[in-house]
């Protein structure tokens, strides 16, 4: 079975995904969507994203294999799987036999996985927000919108890859 790699993110109208290690907005419907989508699947994140989650939840994301990409794996708790490369992250996820693995941030990790992603699930916010972290630039000619669910202040949009980023 081939594992699908999906990037999932909430992105402001100006591309912002974070500010000072936090998400600069609160939309409960989006958090519910994130949880319902990722529970039971491996999630890959960078160390700073993990630290933000650990601060908010007092631990890793529950009911998910938390794979943390870091240069200092010895500094992470045993409750997560620490890896030092994207290849190792994908291998750990594949070992879980999950059909889909979700990349959940931050910006550098999204950028590293974008070329190999099969799917993007983006919460596209109508408003712009101040922040210091942005989603990487996407070549939209490689992606097709497959599904859109519109809410009052955002839309959840699923895109699938139609061609490779590497030419």
UniProtKB/Swiss-Prot annotation:
PROSITE patterns: DHFR_1, DHFR_2. This is Dihydrofolate reductase 2. It catalyses: (6S)-5,6,7,8-tetrahydrofolate + NADP(+) = 7,8-dihydrofolate + NADPH + H(+). Keywords: NADP, One-carbon metabolism, Oxidoreductase, Plasmid. The gene is folA2. Belongs to the dihydrofolate reductase family. It is an enzyme of class 1 (oxidoreductase). One of its GO terms (molecular function) is dihydrofolate reductase activity. One of its GO terms (cellular component) is cytosol. Pathway: Cofactor biosynthesis; tetrahydrofolate biosynthesis; 5,6,7,8-tetrahydrofolate from 7,8-dihydrofolate: step 1/1. Residues 4-167 form the DHFR domain. Its EC number is 1.5.1.3. One of its GO terms (biological process) is dihydrofolate metabolic process. It comes from the Archaea. SUPFAM superfamilies: Dihydrofolate reductase-like (SSF53597). Key enzyme in folate metabolism. Catalyzes an essential reaction for de novo glycine and purine synthesis, and for DNA precursor synthesis. The keyword Oxidoreductase applies. Gene3D superfamilies: Dihydrofolate Reductase, subunit A.
